[in-house]
């Protein structure tokens, strides 16, 4: 599984790199604080379908990086051609 640090993600965003950002936390967590992207709670990840025309990397995040790893493992089985990245240690560093 590929990981990306928060500083690497910020660099990609500053460079204007095309990517998809997915938050797999629950709705209340997302509403309280998020770094953008699409909310797809871990409990609903089986409903997600990637856009066939979008081949950009998918950055998946949660609070500490555990739920995002689970989501990526499941999605990688279903969508092996997509380049998934786990946000290392999640967004917990931003919550403190």
Question: Each predicted region: which residue ranges?
Answer:
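Short, surface-exposed ligand- or partner-binding patches at beta-edge/loop junctions that are enriched
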Residues: 61-62
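Rhodanese-like catalytic fold shared by cysteine-dependent sulfurtransferases
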Residues: 1-20, 24-57, 66-96
């Amino acid at each position: 599984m590929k990981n990306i640090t928060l500083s690497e993600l910020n660099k990609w965003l500053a460079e204007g790199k095309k990517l998809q950002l997915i938050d797999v936390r629950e709705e209340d967590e997302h509403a309280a604080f998020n770094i953008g992207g699409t909310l797809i709670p871990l409990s609903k990840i089986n409903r997600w379908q990637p856009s066939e025309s979008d081949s950009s990397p998918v950055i998946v995040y949660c609070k500490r990086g555990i739920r995002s790893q689970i989501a990526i493992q499941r999605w990688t089985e279903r969508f092996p051609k997509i380049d998934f990245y786990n946000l290392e240690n999640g967004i917990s560093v931003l919550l403190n």
